[in-house]
């Protein structure tokens, strides 16, 4: 984190093209670190991304944990100055791009790791879109207006009133049948933690 150039040569498991990957690419660009555009190769002078299984951001973290704990590697063709050397290298995974709760999973399982960049640094990456079939939307104008109105109202209330944030956390826990409302509330607010003397951040949302 203190020396961005040390990211050169790392291998990161990621959903390539997803928003969390975009945040990492923005970080690389801001710090003038090359990105290897070929996920089947390894460039020691660039940040290398490998696709996570099933394009799943939770699998990105699971693959990082697996690599660090069991020595799991990915075979990558070596590239030097843009040219293949003919060698294939077995490289461990050094990091992952993910969304909460993937970050908490990683830090719970591993030591010696920290967060490097997040949507707190590139807040515009968190824009939200609602995708609908145009024909259906035109035929159901009242419903579409109601969806938008209620979404905007809820978002506004959650930002302003803590009891709404608590209720939203309860809804998430119930909807996904995962963890407790307090778990989600704390992660939505963001937590600064320390493990083995190393600080890291988990969670946190621009809406708050």
Where are each of the predicted segments found?
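A conserved helix-loop-strand patch within extracytoplasmic ligand-binding domains
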Residues: 1-90, 112-122, 128, 134-138
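Structured segments of extracytoplasmic/periplasmic soluble domains
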Residues: 15, 27-34, 63-67, 105, ...
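Short, Asp-centered acidic motifs that coordinate Mg2+ and/or phosphate
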Residues: 93-95
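Short beta-strand and adjacent tight-turn residues that come in two discontinuous sequence segments
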Residues: 97-99
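Alpha-helix capping/helix-boundary segments
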Residues: 101-103
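Secondary-structure end/capping motifs
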Residues: 137-208
């Amino acid at each position: 984190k203190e020396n961005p150039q040390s990211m050169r040569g790392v291998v990161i498991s990621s959903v390539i093209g997803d928003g969390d990957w975009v945040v990492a690419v923005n970080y690389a660009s801001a710090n003038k670190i090359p990105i290897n555009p070929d996920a089947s190769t390894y460039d020691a002078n660039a940040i290398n991304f490998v696709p996570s299984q099933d394009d799943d951001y939770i699998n990105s973290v699971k693959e990082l944990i697996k690599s660090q704990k069991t020595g799991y590697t990915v075979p990558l063709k070596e590239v030097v100055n843009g040219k293949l050397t003919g060698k294939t290298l077995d490289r461990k995974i050094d990091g992952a791009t993910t969304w909460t709760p993937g970050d908490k999973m990683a830090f719970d399982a591993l030591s010696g790791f920290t967060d490097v960049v997040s949507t707190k640094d590139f807040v515009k990456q968190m824009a939200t879109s609602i995708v609908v079939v145009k024909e259906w939307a035109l035929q159901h104008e009242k419903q579409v207006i109601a969806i938008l109105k209620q979404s905007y109202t809820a978002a506004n209330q959650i930002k302003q009133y803590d009891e709404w944030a608590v209720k939203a956390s309860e809804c998430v826990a119930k909807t996904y049948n995962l963890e407790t409302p307090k778990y989600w509330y704390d992660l939505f607010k963001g937590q600064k933690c320390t493990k083995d003397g190393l600080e890291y951040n988990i969670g946190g949302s621009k809406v708050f």
